[in-house]
Amino acid sequence: MADPTVIVVGNEKGGAGKSTLAIHIVTGLLHAGKRVAIIDLDLRQRSMSRFFANRAAWAEANGAGLPMPTEPDMGDGKTLAKADEAEQLNRFEAAFAEARNRADVILIDTPGGDTVLSRTAHGLADQIVTPMNDSFVDFDLLGQVDPVTLDLLKPSIYSESVWEARKHRAITQGRHAQIDWIVV
C-alpha cells in the first residue's frame, strides 16, 4: 500500500475556520470513497473530533449509514495539552503511525498558535491548507502588507514556518520532495 497523503489544515490565527474547513475536506474525501484518518491537534477544543463523534452517535441512533473517518486515540486532549512536549510528541507519533496503516489520507487539524505538535505536523504534510478571511488581520498571516499599496513588505512568522517545513522536507527527502501550500 502506498503512503497516505497527509493534509494539514494550518494557520496560526485562531478563528480562521481551520476546523470547519477540515471537517468539509474529510467529509468530501469520505464520500469520494477514500479511507480517511483524522488527528485533531487542537487539544483543548477538539472541534473536529467532537464533530465526528457527534456525527457517529447521530448516525447510529438514526440508522444512517454515513462514512466515518478513523481517529487514533491520543487520550484526553486537555490532559495532553498540559503534558510536556516530549509526551505530546510521543502520543502524536504513535497516532500518526497508526493512521498511516489505516488510511489513504491523513488529515491533521492544528490549533491557532505555534506549538511543537503543529510544527511537527507541518513537516509531515504533503499539502498545507490555510483558510483565511478577507481582512488585513488575516493577510498579515501571509506577510506584512502595506495597507495603501497592498505590496508585500515581508513574510510573516507563519509563512516562514511553512518555508522551514518545505526546506526540511527537501533536505531530508530530496530536492524534488515538496509540500503544496494552498491558501483559501
Model regions and ranges:
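Conserved catalytic-core segment of NTP-binding enzymes
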Residues: 32, 108-184
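Active-site signature of alpha/beta-hydrolase-fold catalytic machinery across serine-
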Residues: 24, 28, 120
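P-loop/Walker-type NTP enzyme "switch/lid" segment
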Residues: 6-16, 31-105, 112, 147, ...
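Hydrophobic positions on the alpha1 helix immediately C-terminal to the Walker A/P-loop
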Residues: 21
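Phosphate-binding P-loop
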Residues: 1-4
